[in-house]
């Protein structure tokens, strides 16, 4: 190896020049004072070199031919301080690795072939004996189903039906509006309230809201008007806020606030609707889970099963009672629901209140008679009523067109 190569390989033994040290170098973690003596440690004094040579001589054996001879100083200076290991070229190493890898792959391939040969030929699977036109139901299926599916509500649990009914009977007293509140309103009348409820029925149909949402909204309106005086210009705002609250409480996907602003023909702003919603919540003390006529009807249908037509007629009569505050605010929702059930059952099946329902509700026909007569008069005058949204709603085939059914001539034969 030439002196030039030795100088290149031994650059770490050459004292660094001052120009190689940067002025503003990177600061080492901590100030290590001992490490600043590095350049001085590279200088080797002559006595130290001679001592190294003597030590190397003393290590020779006695029988060695060079024993006792001191090598020339010039020759010692040419000997390198340590030997340098030169790695083999990368191409040779890579070649050996490639050969070894190929050998391992060949061995693995031979083992795999032997295993597959021992397994033998795979037998085909037996065909499933199912007709190709057979379809499996999917929870994501959104196809139209001709058969009407009955929705089971959370209040229709048979094991807890009695406890639920008892709880609802207690809550309906707490959430009952004042019967004569309209007489204390200085600027609105019962006819204005009827127009508002009729409009809410149309809103519910437009956005395909649940019937329960309508019942809750009317309950919120009546309870709010029982405590607060409202100007006629703000009555629709109260109804809009009540419908918004009921939608949030009952619907899975309630309409946005902007939708309610739109249906008022931009009469009110979004800020006004939200502010009224906040006021309604404060007046109602955040008690939104009010029992409704529809909840009681569903319970009565569980105790005394009837045809879908009787169910639709009962719900039609229940919604008719929402339009006029007088006289139906005098009755509890459970009583109005029972009266609607009796009239519908008498109209279609010519039957009245059954014994299981008497035992379940503790209501007798004699107890229900005043409400039955009031609701029957409303049923008779439904076709000539000024507000027709409920009647139009129940003309639809999905509701069995029960609003077109002619009411019985008299209820006295059934009572």
From Swiss-Prot:
GO cellular component annotations, sorted alphabetically?
Answer: cyclin A2-CDK2 complex; cyclin-dependent protein kinase holoenzyme complex; cytoplasm; microtubule organizing center; nucleus
Q: Tell me the lineage of the source organism.
A: Eukaryota, Metazoa, Chordata, Craniata, Vertebrata
Write out the similarity annotation.
Belongs to the cyclin family. Cyclin AB subfamily.
Give compartment(s): Nucleus; Cytoplasm
Organism of provenance:
Xenopus laevis (African clawed frog)
Q: GO: which molecular function terms?
A: cyclin-dependent protein serine/threonine kinase regulator activity
Q: List the InterPro entries hit by this protein, alphabetically.
A: Cyclin, Cyclin-A_N, Cyclin-like_dom, Cyclin-like_sf, Cyclin_A/B-like, Cyclin_C-dom, Cyclin_N, Cyclins_cyclin-box
Matches recorded under PANTHER family: CYCLINS
Name the domain of life this protein comes from: Eukaryota
Tell me which tissues or organs this protein is expressed in. Ubiquitous.
Biological function: Cyclin which controls both the G1/S and the G2/M transition phases of the cell cycle. Functions through the formation of specific serine/threonine kinase holoenzyme complexes with the cyclin-dependent protein kinases CDK1 and CDK2. The cyclin subunit confers the substrate specificity of these complexes and differentially interacts with and activates CDK1 and CDK2 throughout the cell cycle.
Biological processes annotated in GO: cell cycle G1/S phase transition; cell division; G1/S transition of mitotic cell cycle; G2/M transition of mitotic cell cycle
| Pfam families linked to this entry | Cyclin_C, Cyclin_N, Cyclin_N2
Query: What name does the UniProt record give this protein?
Result: Cyclin-A2
| Xref: CDD domains | CYCLIN_CCNA2_rpt1, CYCLIN_CCNA2_rpt2
Subunit-structure text = Interacts with the CDK1 and CDK2 protein kinases to form serine/threonine kinase holoenzyme complexes.
Q: Which keywords, in A-to-Z order, does the entry hold?
A: Cell cycle, Cell division, Cyclin, Cytoplasm, Mitosis, Nucleus
* UniProt main location, coarse: nucleus
